[in-house]
Structure formats: structure tokens, C-alpha cells
Regions:
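Short functional hotspots at interaction and active-site rims
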Residues: 1-213
Length: 213
């Protein structure tokens, strides 16, 4: 029958989420977050997050003839990592910074003070995870100084953060080139940054259920 093939189930990679997301406490916090964020004009929302990039990351899938394996060489690296921290709004990538190794509170404060705050505006609401490295007591005054404010994302809620969709695309882009140095990561990020346009940003916001009309 026409259309039957399209309706048949296919093997797919699972989208896994923490089991904590289903607890009553976290569900309550997620609902509370939506009550707060719905009071904010989407044009003023700025979503912040970070991702880790292992040097030498490469594609894990390839194509081959049926019944044959796919072989490739994996770039050699010693477990080095680059952290990418960024922020996006409905209209633009607001700020982006990379650093070697993991993020700590001092590095995060440098990002906020030197990269993020100069790009903010009065009425901007910065949404971010409530992580120890984010050191809210030191960050909030920096935002308030330019008329911006802070809103903590509910825990276990990456599905509420549009920048996660950009991170997913960025990692797929980086895997195509398997960068083995931080400098190469920076070059590729600059290229990826040029490829982002307002349509992408609006689609990412809409995919996370933020009303953009």
C-alpha cells in the first residue's frame, strides 16, 4: 500500500536524558522556569552554555558496500580538550570564546566580563545553568551594570536551551575535519560562525518551544 513503507519503524539512535528529569522536584522546577521565561520578550533572551571538544574527534559512521566494514584512521591525541563557551540570542551569536582544558569560575568570569557584557543591552535576560563554575554571586553584578539580568535554567533541561542545537551541529562540523590542535578548532569555529544566520537561530528557539512569532 502507498505510504506503508514510510510508516514502518526504523532503527534510530536514542536521545537519552537523565532519569532525574522525571523526578517530581525537577518537573516542578521546569514548570517554574517556564512561568518565569514566558514573562520575557524572546528578543531579550540570551542563552549561554559551554561544550567540550576533544582534540582529534572524528566521524563515527561511514558508508560501505553491504556486508563490508568501514575502516578509517583516528587522529592521535593525548586526551586534550578545548572548551567552547558561547551565548546566542534570537538574532545573533552574541559571544564566543575558547580555552584549553575545562572551564573554572575565573575563566567564566573573563568570558562574561570581556566577551558577553560588552554585547548585552538594557533588558537582556541571560539564561544559563546554575553550575559551580558560573559563580552567580560574581556574575550577576556584571550583568546588572549594563541593565541586563540573570535567569537560571531549570536543572536537567538542555531541551530548553536553543544553543544546545548549535553545539550539536558544531560537533558534527568539527568531526569532518578532526582538528588536532586548539588553533585548528579556532579556525573551524570562525568558519562555522560565518555560516550561522538568523533563520538558524529562530529555528533553534522555536524547536525549544519559545514563541518567536
Amino acid at each position: 500500500m502507498p505510504g506503508v513503507a514510510e510508516a514502518e519503524p526504523h532503527a534510530k539512535k536514542k536521545t537519552l536524558r537523565s532519569s532525574q528529569c522525571a523526578t517530581e522536584r525537577v518537573q516542578g522546577l521546569r514548570q517554574e522556569y517556564w512561568k518565569q521565561v514566558q514573562q520575557v520578550d524572546p528578543e531579550n533572551l540570551v542563552f549561554l552554555d559551554e561544550m567540550g571538544v576533544l582534540l582529534g574527534l572524528t566521524r563515527t559512521h561511514g558508508r560501505s558496500l553491504e556486508g563490508s566494514r568501514v575502516y578509517d584512521l583516528r587522529p592521535f591525541y593525548r586526551g586534550a580538550k578545548v572548551t567552547v563557551v558561547g551565548a546566542i540570542s534570537l538574532n545573533q551569536v552574541v559571544a564566543l570564546m575558547t580555552l584549553n582544558g575545562s572551564m573554572d569560575s575565573n575563566a567564566f568570569e573573563v568570558f562574561v566580563q570581556q566577551c558577553l557584557v560588552p554585547q548585552l543591552w538594557s533588558g537582556a535576560v541571560v539564561v544559563m545553568d546554575n553550575l559551580p563554575a558560573h559563580s552567580v554571586t560574581r556574575i550577576e553584578p556584571l550583568l546588572q551594570a549594563v541593565g541586563a539580568s540573570l535567569l537560571n535554567l531549570s536543572p536537567y533541561s538542555p531541551d530548553f536551551n536553543p544553543i544546545e542545537l548549535w553545539w550539536s551541529q558544531l560537533k558534527a562540523f568539527l568531526r569532518q575535519f578532526s582538528p588536532t590542535t586548539a588553533h585548528k578548532v579556532d579556525i573551524l569555529l570562525a568558519t562555522a560562525l560565518d555560516l550561522v544566520n538568523p533563520i538558524h537561530l529562530r529555528n533553534w528557539f522555536a524547536n525549544c518551544c519559545y514563541c518567536i512569532s
